[in-house]
Structures are given as structure tokens and as C-alpha cells.
Swiss-Prot record:
Alphabetical keyword list: Dioxygenase, Iron, Metal-binding, Oxidoreductase
Disulfide linkage: none
Catalytic reaction(s) noted: prekainate + 2-oxoglutarate + O2 = kainate + succinate + CO2 + H2O; prekainate + 2-oxoglutarate + O2 + H(+) = kainate lactone + succinate + CO2 + H2O
Top enzyme category: oxidoreductase
Residues annotated as domain Fe2OG dioxygenase: 200-310
Regulation of catalytic or functional activity: Inhibited by the iron chelator EDTA.
UniProt organism field: Digenea simplex
Name the UniProt record assigns to this protein: Alpha-ketoglutarate dependent kainoid synthase
Length: 360
């Protein structure tokens, strides 16, 4: 157990030491799903085809279906994401004592390792807390010196950060243009300060084939939650047995599995963007399921999760005024719970409140 501090708040990493033997990933041998397997709530969007006012208006309709959508044909070489996955898998195969050297709750600032079951999302799963059944490595990007086990690890992670930051900026710019089709008084420059590569970090994640221990109360690999971010980008690779672990929950409580589509990026609208648009855009409620007891073998999955944080100074747009029936009331519940209103706040305050209750 490691006890350290983040912004003066004591945090405990009570992770579980585990031995791993992860084989390298080969993209051509993975059980990808076709785009036709996507449910209607999760559209696949090519941003190169979103240009005209009509296309922007349809894009806005599509991203409001669930707050989650795929970006395809984005131009990021698949070798970058696969290289990231394999560098982390190689790291995880080291003894826990060697990995532990990179374990620190400063990971959100300058990278670092989080052991299996080392975190728990405060406020997720209706405040029923459980540990996350995942091992992670956070990466802040080339603007800082990250903790890294070797140069190859750093090169792949820096390049993934650069490419996904460029894609995120294109996505954000398109979203802001699309908002103007519904709210003519809104101007994209109003929220342009949220486009800042220094606001992004990502985590490399593996969900091992690990069921709960006997007597352990755990309903999910990762409990249902909404990200605090402006937007979140996610690349995911499939489980060998075809199990679809990632899911979203719709407004009526329906659970919809999210199939992994080859070399594509999921976009989750975050609570930050929902807050700044006065809950017009819905933050996606999502989590990761366990397989059933007969389906654990081959259920390991992995993902690269890039959090694009909002600008520190946060003021909801005065020119985005949705009708009552257009508002997603529960879309930024963490912001509501910590007492953030239309008068604005700083993201540092929101983040501090989050970290205060994040780690078990």
C-alpha cells in the first residue's frame, strides 16, 4: 500500500499485487466487430463528411442520441495504438516490485502506474463503491516529463497523445460549429479556450481475466459513471471470446453494449461540455461489465482513454438556452453535487473535489 498526497489531500493506493503474462497484440488476429454491429444509439461518423450546415445539424442530432459516438476514417495509423498497448503489456509483465517504482498519485500530473484494483470512482454506481478491476498507466503528454520505464514506451505514448490531441481538437471544433446550427446566437469563439493540448492526458488500461474474490462485492469491472472531461476519446480492442464489456446506459436505464470497431475512436461527451452547454449535450453514462461466470476465459480487454479537460475558467454559455425538453437533467451530476451553478467555476475546483474522493 502506498500513501501519498495530491493537492494536499491524502490518498491511498490499496492495489492488489498480481503477476501478469500478457501476450503481444496483433491487430489482424483480433476479433473486431464490423460497423454494421453498432446499435442505432452509437453512430459511426466520418468528420471529413461533416462540413455543410445540413451535415453539421445532422451531426448534432447524432451525438445527442446517447452522448457517445465513433469517429472513423480519422487518419491515425493503427500501429500507434497497437504499439502503445504492447509497450504497456510488456511493462505489466515485469514483477510488481519493478512496476511499483512508477506508482504515484501524481500520475494525473506527470504520468504513472496504478496497480490492479488501485482506484475506485467516487460517486459512480449510485455511490455504491467498489474497486476498479483494471491496471492502468497514465500519460500526460510531451508537454511534461512523464514517468516512463523506457524510451520506446515514451515514444509510443507521446505519439499517441499528439495524434489523439489533434483529433480531439477537430472533434471539439466540429461540435462548436454544430451548436451554432441550433443556437444561432452562439459563436464558437465563446468556448475556444477549451481547445488546449495541455488539457489532455490519457490512460493505458488492461482489464484482466479476473473475477471478484470470494465474498467480494463487485458488480462491474468499472462502475457506471460520467467523465468529468470536456470530451473523452477511447480506443478499445476486443476480448478474444467476443465479450463486449463496455456499455452505456440510456436515459430509461437500458444497457447497450459497445462493440469494438477496428482503428476507430469512441467519443464520450463529458460533464464539462454538458455543463458549458447548459445540459443540452448529454454526458455519456458508461461502465465496464464482468462476463458471466462461464465466460471469463478470453474476456481480457484493453483500452486507451484520452481525457480532454475543459479550460480552467468555466462559465456556461449565455447563448445556449435549450428548451426544457432538450435538457438532460442528470448529465453533469458531479458538478451539481459539488455546488456548481450557472455563475461559473474553475475546473481546478471540480477536479480537486473529484480527487478528494477518488481513491480507496
Amino acid at each position: 500500500m502506498t500513501v501519498s498526497k495530491y493537492n494536499g489531500v491524502a490518498s491511498t493506493f490499496n492495489g492488489v499485487a498480481r503477476r501478469f503474462d500478457f501476450a503481444p497484440l496483433e491487430a489482424d488476429k483480433l476479433n473486431w466487430y464490423p460497423r454494421s454491429a453498432l446499435p442505432p444509439e452509437i453512430p459511426a461518423i466520418d468528420l471529413n463528411k461533416v462540413n455543410t450546415e445540413e451535415e453539421l445539424a445532422q451531426f448534432l442530432v447524432d451525438i445527442r442520441k446517447s452522448g457517445l459516438f465513433y469517429i472513423v476514417d480519422h487518419g491515425i495509423p493503427e500501429e500507434i495504438s497497437i504499439g502503445c498497448y504492447n509497450a504497456f503489456r510488456e511493462f505489466c509483465n515485469l514483477p510488481e516490485e519493478a512496476r511499483e517504482k512508477y506508482n504515484t498519485d501524481e500520475s494525473f500530473k506527470s504520468g504513472g502506474y496504478v496497480p490492479f484494483k488501485g482506484t475506485s470512482i467516487g460517486g459512480g454506481n449510485l455511490f455504491e463503491r467498489q474497486k476498479d478491476f483494471v491496471v492502468k498507466f497514465f500519460w500526460r503528454g510531451p508537454s511534461v516529463v512523464n514517468r516512463s520505464p523506457n524510451d520506446r514506451f515514451a515514444e509510443f505514448h507521446d505519439e499517441h497523445h499528439r495524434k489523439t490531441a489533434e483529433l480531439a481538437e477537430k472533434i471539439i471544433t466540429t461540435i462548436l460549429k454544430a451548436l451554432k446550427t441550433r443556437f444561432p446566437e452562439f459563436h464558437p469563439d465563446e468556448l475556444k479556450d477549451n481547445i488546449n493540448v495541455r488539457n489532455m492526458f490519457f490512460s493505458n488500461r488492461i482489464y484482466p481475466e479476473a473475477p471478484p474474490d470470494d465474498g467480494e462485492k463487485a458488480d462491474y469491472r468499472l462502475v457506471p459513471h460520467r467523465d468529468l472531461s470536456f470530451i473523452t476519446l477511447a480506443n478499445q480492442v476486443p476480448a478474444n471470446n467476443g465479450f463486449k464489456g463496455l456499455f452505456i446506459l440510456t436515459g430509461d436505464g437500458e444497457k447497450i453494449p459497445v462493440p469494438p470497431i477496428r482503428n476507430s475512436y469512441l467519443v464520450f461527451i463529458g460533464q464539462g461540455l454538458s455543463y458549458l452547454t447548459n445540459k443540452y449535450l448529454p454526458a455519456a453514462l458508461h461502465g465496464v461489465d464482468f462476463p458471466d461466470n462461464t465466460n471469463f476465459e478470453g474476456s481480457e480487454r484493453a483500452s486507451l482513454i484520452s481525457f480532454y479537460e475543459p479550460n480552467d475558467y468555466m462559465m456556461p454559455s449565455k447563448n445556449i438556452n435549450p428548451l426544457p425538453e432538450e435538457i438532460f437533467e442528470k448529465s453533469c451530476t458531479f458538478y451539481d453535487d459539488v455546488g456548481v451553478g450557472r455563475a461559473g467555476t474553475t475546473y481546478n475546483y471540480v477536479r480537486y473535489k473529484f480527487h478528494e474522493g477518488y481513491y480507496l
